[in-house]
Amino acid sequence: MIPSAITSPAPDRRALSDFRALAGRIDGNGPRYTSYPTADRFHNGPDLSLYHDALAACRADAPAPLSLYLHIPFCENICYYCGCNKIITRDHGRSARYVNYLGREMALVADRLGPRRQVLQSHWGGGTPTFLDPGEMRRVMALLHEHFELAAEGEHSIEIDPRRVDHARMALLAELGFNRVSLGVQDFDPEVQQAIHRIQPFEETRAVVDAARTLGFRSVSLDLIYGLPHQTAARFGRTIDQVLALRPDRLSVYSYAHLPHVFKPQRRIDENALPPAGEKLDILVSTIERLSAEGYVYIGMDHFALPDDDLAVAQREGRLQRNFQGYSTHAGYDQVGLGISAIGAIAGRYVQNARTLDEYYGALDHGRLPLARGVAMSADDHLRREIIGALMCNGVLDIPALEARHGIRFGTAFAPELADLAALGADGLVQCAPDRITVTPLGRLLVRRVAMVFDRYLREDAARPASTGAQAVAANDGAQPVRFVPRARYSRVV
């Protein structure tokens, strides 16, 4: 029987040693595959028929449960590293208007989906969702309950800025039905915090974590970033010491993507203070070693969880999936996106809302869904999304089962990809057999690179002349190397 999931808790010492040797040669820029096709492949333009068709198909699938993402874009202060869609303001009057328009959007969406569809997973992201005052948070939650049925047994999470909440606000979140919280930390080192314009003492974060534990939240997650200015392996190790003292249920340790040509706030970061590639690699490897030694399960890419956390259990049982929030246990449901720039994944279509308040408000003032762009998935997209998801989440692709579901001959349909995989196999990233493809412990550390092999859009890019100055990632097609040309928003694989 083909295994349904990865069973090893983390890459072993040999894999980490090989990773150090290989990373510099195989590194490059690539997608994170929170969707396929990736968001940069969406078609610009408000094709409302695409969204209407998606909602109609979702309505026909009732009473299947939904996932819901709600975007609150406001922040009081700018963090220089941030690449999120955000609005920096101290005018809390702006959020009151935004809440009213969220209600309008919910009404339009719910009217097409059918009344009070059940929501098993919801997530408030930003920006800073806790920018909203208590009254506004109650109002948004009341609107959600008016138009949807938020299942009490579901997973309902919110991103928190520990600098903006106290015990009373945490108690309010629990009262409103949130059972998971995600806290932005990035790094506890004072010099790093100064360089990224985010001063957040450890004691401030500990108070919020303690409140979450006291109030009975099901899960507490912390977000860290490595590759920030002034970081070293030793300094980041001290941050890990402090994080381990808090013992979060989940940890995300993201690689900082320095893209000042895309994200203007990053232009305030001193590039000379960024850790060199070798030091950044040391930070990552030492972090994986330390967290593994402390009992955390390496979920994949940048996610870690305690063994009894839902993510770790889902991985062991082969139920792990990915969506726009990363690894998830509920990614198989249609996801509705609400608020500016929010992305929905509904009935084989991706839809993204307008990115500015003016466009968002303007559409809703005319009684229209605030769609900005999207794409309808082809049969090939569905097939490749399943392959990429299996490799990134479970580490195993069951070829006979895939062939049966999609009516294909894998070896014929993916001959160029298999040739590329042979090259990655020679580097120890994958093991290929007639009935399966298995990602090795080393390959788990570079799983984005493995997934890129099956990205048809990257192959089409590679077939066109590379843009001037673009850095390409080589892959072997059995004859001449394929050059995967990175796009502007892609971050480094390592």
From Swiss-Prot:
GO terms for cellular component: cytoplasm. Gene3D superfamilies: 1.10.10.920, tm_1862 like domain. It is an enzyme of class 1 (oxidoreductase). Keywords: 4Fe-4S, Cytoplasm, Iron, Iron-sulfur, Metal-binding, Oxidoreductase, Porphyrin biosynthesis, S-adenosyl-L-methionine. [4Fe-4S] cluster binds at residues 75, 79, 82. GO terms for biological process: porphyrin-containing compound biosynthetic process; protoporphyrinogen IX biosynthetic process. S-adenosyl-L-methionine 1 binds at residues 69, 126, 159, 343. Its cofactor is [4Fe-4S] cluster. Pathway: Porphyrin-containing compound metabolism; protoporphyrin-IX biosynthesis; protoporphyrinogen-IX from coproporphyrinogen-III (AdoMet route): step 1/1. It catalyses: coproporphyrinogen III + 2 S-adenosyl-L-methionine = protoporphyrinogen IX + 2 5'-deoxyadenosine + 2 L-methionine + 2 CO2. GO terms for molecular function: 4 iron, 4 sulfur cluster binding; coproporphyrinogen dehydrogenase activity; coproporphyrinogen oxidase activity; metal ion binding. Binds 1 [4Fe-4S] cluster. The cluster is coordinated with 3 cysteines and an exchangeable S-adenosyl-L-methionine. Its main location: cytoplasm. Disruption phenotype: Cells lacking this gene accumulate coproporphyrin-III only under anaerobic conditions. Its EC number is 1.3.98.3. S-adenosyl-L-methionine 2 binds at residues 81, 127-128, 186, 198, 223, 257. Induction: Induced under anaerobic conditions. It comes from the Bacteria. CDD domains: Radical_SAM. Residues 60-294 form the Radical SAM core domain. Monomer. HemN is able to complement a S.typhimurium hemF hemN double mutant under aerobic and anaerobic conditions. Belongs to the anaerobic coproporphyrinogen-III oxidase family. Involved in the heme biosynthesis. Catalyzes the anaerobic oxidative decarboxylation of propionate groups of rings A and B of coproporphyrinogen III to yield the vinyl groups in protoporphyrinogen IX. This is Oxygen-independent coproporphyrinogen III oxidase. It comes from Cupriavidus necator (strain ATCC 17699 / DSM 428 / KCTC 22496 / NCIMB 10442 / H16 / Stanier 337).
